Amino acid sequence: MRRRLLRAAVLAPLAGTLATLPGCSLPVQVDGTFLQPWRSHLQWGLADWQRSLKVAHTLGCRQLVLQWTGIVGGSDGDWSLPDGSLQQLFTAASENDIRIRVGLPFQQRWWQAIGADDATLQAFLAESLAHARRWLAQTPWAQQPAFEGWYLPYELEQYHWADPARQQWLAQWLQGLVQAASARGGDCAMSCYFSRLQTDGNLVTLWQAVLAHAAVRPMVQDGVGVAGAGNVQQLQPLLDHFHAHSIGFDAIVELFRELPGGPADGSGFKGETADAARIQRQLAWARDSGAQHVLVYALEPWLTQDTPQAAALRRRWGLPQ
């Protein structure tokens, strides 16, 4: 799942209706949520962050993964959340007893680089590591009381990383990122998903190579939003490996479904909020997976937006309209 493309489906959230929530127990509780910021979040004030974090708190969230703090090399130019916005996020998080895992700036060239030749990939890894080191050296967020750790905003899958040499380059790159991040304080987490593209690679071998060099916390996407319910079966060998080696991981439940008719490469993604029954089955899988935490992707926008599908999910989850 290329989450960079999900912005195509993002609609304006209900700004006020979810701000005041009932005190009753809700039928769904999750450990955390992602938040994928876009340029529209540059306009958010403290009240917007408070609204978003209040919804998360009501559903039991104790962690929010800020997918990235900005984008480098995007088609509409570089941008980043200003310090004032991030401070407001941390303020709202502290008010709601939620800890923030801060995503590094996302290098948009990632998707092109991992599909390119070896020289292009190696150049990208070197340049992006240097950029991340510079950013980490000056960022203050690890000192915030609500700071949980760092998130590396690059998703691993077995298709582009089947070659052992590339696995080693990836592992060394991640080792550099982890070292730079840990110098500021805090661990690093990174997501993975099962690619439907035909390949000789597999996620177990990939994570073995990564964890031999870099102490990265795995976060496993269920992939149901794009690949369907059967995708979780493809993840079982990886989960078995984590269990056998006592490797802690988190599970990510996708709250959306991809609408048919989009390009096969994932560009121009169009999606909508999934139905509550499907999501309930996903949550049951995640809780039975052995994951230490179950996170959803994502309350914003798939629960909060002003669509009939999101409204139906709010009703099922006992939230006001």
Where do the model's predicted regions map?
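Substrate-binding cleft of secreted/luminal carbohydrate-active enzymes
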Residues: 225-227, 248-320
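N-terminal export signals
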Residues: 4-25
